[in-house]
Amino acid sequence: MKTIAILGKPNVGKSSLFNRLIKQHLAITSDVSGTTRDVKRACFDISGVEVELLDTGGIDKAEGLFAKVSANSLKAGQEADLVLYMVDGNVVPQDDDIAYFRTIQKAKKPLVLVINKVDNDKIKQQAWDFACFGAEQMYFISVHHNRGLSILLEAIFELLSLAKEQSLSNNLRSQMDNEEIDESLEEFLGILESTPNKSEENIAVGIIGRVNVGKSSLLNALLGKERSVVSEVAGTTIDPVDDEMDIEGKRVRFVDTAGIRRASKIWGIEKFALLRTNAALAQSHIVILVLDASESFVELDEKISSLIPKHALGVIVVLNKWDKKHKEYKEIIKEFKHRFPFLSFAPVMTLSALNGRNIDKLKKEILKVYQRFAYRIPTSALNDVIAQAVAHHHIPSDHGKIVKIYYATQYATHPPQIALVSNRPESLHFSYKRYIINMLREQFDFEGVPILLSVKGKNAKDEENTSAKKESPSKVSHRESKNRRFV
């Protein structure tokens, strides 16, 4: 697959072009210079051929954080098959822009000068001043008004020689259409059953925590490279940044989400970032909650952790900056258990992202938690445990009426979801459900994994009584989410 990188100084419209081409609002855009800080990747289609597009941070001479952003952007340009260097058509050509452009020219790869914000012919006349760059290919566009983009796409198609790939793709598609499929229904179903589900092959891991607890450093340590920009400046990550790696043959995708601040400090582009954080977690299997061991936990840590039951994710708690811990292990764990009783089922790991302490252990733990997250209990074993639980602690009656559990079945995984079939579904107290879940945790290794337990009626009358109170899994109420955390 061919790769295209969009480079240029801050605030020239790189992220807007990125969003326009991929037809999604994936990169956060703003009038604030330097909004994009990490390289974002997405695929889009040009005349039937898929290409990868990279949205990079602005290139400038700033030091510190933005020097790292510039370095990452230039590196992305070196790895791409085509570079679109973007400038602002409303601004006269700048010497540093020319210098950056000519530096990229030395790489001897296809390079296009894209002049953005050319909203009308008057601006286009002025924009001819950019001929001083010495670009072989120069295109005038306006992302905001969707002007000149079709011509730019045609140029990209030719520069990347995509016609050959399009021809190959069309020939393959035609060949497949002409083949006779003589498999029986049974054979076809057999193929489906033996084919692994791609969504289950790839493990999606979200990394959450408040600002500056070391999430980006942790992501870089896991990947073994600087994928996410790290800085002492609080709130460096704005867009969720994702990347993939193999861990013992399993494909794992990490998402480093925006650091979460107090609500009173959330404004502008950070509001969009928080919405995107929730969206990223909605597609994750496991969440790593990063806490700062160099200082006491705060109320905001607890509020952030409330995102976890909402999405019913596998959980790993990471006490980062352990090399600077403010208390001894026993005291910190005691404080953790006091503040986060609803995470009692989660493994807690101490590590230092900066020096690499326990990073390999964390990788192994991710695989273990996912295995539990995807585990299906054999029905016979499940019912044996339920029978033992009932025998050990009888179900309380409902005002003298006997409550029975007939049987149990696990109807879904990711996370484990179990239904109990009862004669009186509404009479099974939440404390008894918690007891059942604790028994399941005791008998089966479900560390780090939520267990969702529901109770259903045995006959139509029971189902009718419960259906009115039942809600869609995607709209779990705050009350139910809270109860699930404690069971």
Swiss-Prot record:
Molecular-function annotations in GO: GTP binding; ribosome binding
An individual GO BP term: ribosome biogenesis
EngA-type G domain sequence ranges: 2-164, 203-374
Region (Disordered) location: 459-487
Presence of keyword ATP-binding: no
Positions with biased composition (Basic and acidic residues): 459-480
Binding site for GTP 1: 8-15, 55-59, 116-119
Residues that coordinate or bind GTP 2: 209-216, 256-260, 320-323
Pfam families, sorted: KH_dom-like, MMR_HSR1
Keywords: GTP-binding, Nucleotide-binding, Repeat, Ribosome biogenesis
Entry keyword Nucleotide-binding: yes
Signal peptide span: none
Domain KH-like: 375-459
Binding partners and assembly: Associates with the 50S ribosomal subunit.
Family: Belongs to the TRAFAC class TrmE-Era-EngA-EngB-Septin-like GTPase superfamily. EngA (Der) GTPase family.
PANTHER family: GTPASE DER
Protein role: GTPase that plays an essential role in the late steps of ribosome biogenesis.
Protein name, per record: GTPase Der
Top-level taxonomy: Bacteria, Pseudomonadati, Campylobacterota, Epsilonproteobacteria, Campylobacterales
